[in-house]
Design a protein with these regions (language model features):
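Hydrophobic alpha-helical bundle signature of multipass membrane enzymes
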Residues: 2-201, 211, 215-224
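Short, active-site-adjacent segments that bind or coordinate small-molecule cofactors and metal centers
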Residues: 208
Length: 226
């Protein structure tokens, strides 16, 4: 009796796909020293992404496709989310009479430290981007080719740096202006959704980014205030 193992072999091959074309300026960031935050990379929650061939990844691709068909934000909004994810939150924060302005919070160095930490995580997992595995699952998605090849998505997929930046900004803003926490988090969620709309991230990339903000980055920020 002949047994067809072609699908199993194909699954093994697709699971070997990683994102290997990280833009040099981003990979170099992983070697930088933190300026403000004290973060122990070895103590961060290490949760591996779904396998490329998994049913979970297929469901994630279906969610990407569905969002792309259902949500039609302006190009200006998508560009804004890509160019300045934390600014989406802090621009609003600065307009609502906060007790301390964002420029006094040392945002530049905080976001620099976030980028160092996130790129370390990305390089650790090396997760493929959605476009690399969509054909295997026979799910058609659109993706921003310029952003993916030479722009802000020229790194491994997991976790999402833009989502991490936006949610870190939202949590910092909420700490200083807690009565507007819902509004800050809503803005961060728009940034997270924009990365799925652009076809450059899986939903779980966003979920892991938020977990890292809550369990690593925000506690590190609060320690700087003591």
């Amino acid at each position: 009796m002949n047994v067809d193992f072609s699908q199993e072999i194909l699954a093994l091959e697709v699971d070997k796909i990683y994102f290997e074309n990280t833009k040099k300026e981003y990979s170099e960031q992983a070697k930088d020293n933190y300026k403000v935050l004290s973060i122990d990379f070895t103590k961060a929650p290490m949760i591996s992404p779904f396998k490329n061939s998994s049913l979970e990844t297929k469901k994630e691709l279906e969610k990407i496709s569905a969002l792309q068909n259902q949500w039609n934000p302006s190009k200006e909004l998508l560009m804004r989310c890509d160019d300045d994810p934390d600014g989406v939150v802090f621009d609003f924060y600065d307009k609502v009479n906060p007790p301390i302005k964002s420029k006094e919070i040392n945002i530049k160095d905080l976001m620099s430290d976030l980028n160092i930490f996130i790129i370390k995580m990305k390089m650790h997992f090396g997760r493929a981007r959605p476009f690399q595995v969509s054909d295997y699952h026979n799910i058609e998605i659109d993706y921003n080719k310029k952003m993916q090849k030479t722009g802000t998505a020229a790194t491994p997929s997991y976790p999402s740096g833009h989502t991490a930046a936006a949610y870190f900004a939202a949590e910092i803003a909420s700490h200083h202006k807690p009565q507007l926490e819902k509004e800050f988090l809503n803005l961060a969620n728009i940034v997270a959704l924009s990365r799925i709309k652009e076809g450059v991230h899986f939903p779980s990339d966003n979920e892991y980014a938020i977990k890292l903000v809550n369990e690593v980055l925000m506690p590190a920020y609060l320690r700087t205030l003591k």
